[in-house]
Swiss-Prot record:
HAMAP family: FBPase_class1 (MF_01855). There are two genes for FBPase in R.capsulatus. It catalyses: beta-D-fructose 1,6-bisphosphate + H2O = beta-D-fructose 6-phosphate + phosphate. Belongs to the FBPase class 1 family. Mg(2+) 2 binds at D98, D101, E261. The keyword RNA-binding does not apply. Its EC number is 3.1.3.11. The keyword Coiled coil does not apply. It comes from the Bacteria. One of its GO terms (cellular component) is cytosol. The gene is fbp. It holds the Pfam family FBPase_C. It comes from Rhodobacter capsulatus (strain ATCC BAA-309 / NBRC 16581 / SB1003). This is Fructose-1,6-bisphosphatase class 1.
Length: 331
């Protein structure tokens, strides 16, 4: 048994898909733990459909998941590493996946992961995925860290498993009930500050101002460059994550993929009372216009996410005045 699914009320088809995802995840955890012994998993091997560099492990993970899901209830397989949707058969499910999230961390032994999303399949491969994230029937991730864990929602809460290395199966832990609300942590890549829109800069300036600023408390910044790792920390400890669009070429809509990354993470976060937006609009209500569409992404504690939206709702002149008054990074 690759994963404990008893009592979750899953259909046999969905349970089979989850079992196969878990089995590949367990295999990848072992492969990652042996990086460099036989193969350099961080070796560059090309670029993916979005123009990002591919590592050997990206391709290996994609191949492993696709092969494991062939012949199952998954009719359509959409991967960040594939240009188009791959038709696997005549099943009833459509699975979107980022096979290896955070691949820049492979060679520095920092947590990486797999993100997946499952929809009911339609008659068309693309329309099976170009739909509201609220229509997902499952969304989750596998994190390959000091522990290998699997976190997933089927629309009725958030379930949590950890890989038992002795049995090579995922043992179920208590469900994740709610996000911690009083956490003074935020995650953003501050090196891009000069490129951000003024509402994001104003929001971050207020956090950096700490106890002497308008928020009246000190905050700590985190940045791991692995969406799975950031998500796992927020589920365990609370806080807020921001990856805004910015002024750089190719970054107007951020860099995270709507279908493969943001929709499933938003599905999880909202199940425990959190929020997930593009800075202004609800991610789960948005319709991606193409398979590899990108979106700005803000998620975490609902109150913090709502505060980011409030900064965007200010008239432009008010945001500019706020920024000029509180802009701590100004030279």
């Amino acid at each position: 048994m690759a994963i404990e699914l008893e009592g979750l009320g899953l259909s046999p088809e969905l349970a089979d898909v989850m079992t196969r995802l878990a089995r590949v995840g367990a295999d990848l955890a072992r492969t990652i733990a042996r990086n460099g012994v036989e193969t350099d998993l961080a070796a560059g091997v090309g670029t993916n459909a979005g123009g990002d560099g591919q590592k050997a492990l990206d391709v290996m993970a994609d191949d492993a998941f696709r092969e494991a899901l062939t012949g199952t209830a998954v009719a359509y397989y959409a991967s960040e590493e594939q240009d188009e949707v791959v038709t696997l058969g005549k099943g009833t499910l459509a699975l979107a996946i980022d096979p290896l999230d955070g691949s820049s961390n492979i060679d520095v032994n920092v947590s990486i992961g797999t993100i997946f999303s499952i929809f009911p399949a339609t008659d068309d491969p693309n329309t099976s995925f170009l739909r509201k994230g609220s229509e997902q029937i499952a969304g989750g991730y596998i994190i390959y860290g000091p522990q290998c864990a699997l976190v997933c929602s089927f629309g009725r809460g958030v379930h949590h498993w950890v890989l038992d290395l002795d049995s090579r199966s995922f043992k179920r832990l208590p469900d994740i009930k709610a996000l911690p609300q009083d956490t003074s942590e935020y995650a953003i890549n501050a090196s891009n500050y000069r490129h951000w829109p003024s509402p994001i800069r104003a929001f971050i300036d207020d956090l950096v101002a700490g106890a002497e600023g308008p928020r009246g408390r000190n905050f700590n910044m985190r940045w791991i460059a692995s969406l799975v790792a950031e998500t796992h920390r927020i589920l365990m400890r609370g806080g807020v994550f921001l990856y805004p669009g910015d002024e750089r070429k190719g970054y107007a809509r951020g860099r995270l993929r709507h279908v493969y990354e943001c929709a499933p993470i938003a599905f999880l976060i909202t199940q425990v009372g959190g929020g997930a937006t593009d800075g202004c609009e609800d991610i789960l209500s948005a319709l991606p216009d193409k398979l590899h569409a990108r979106t700005p992404f803000v998620f975490g504690c609902a109150a913090k996410v709502a505060r980011v939206t409030a900064y965007h709702d200010l008239p432009g002149e008010e945001t500019s005045a706020l920024f000029n008054t509180r802009g701590l990074f100004r030279s």
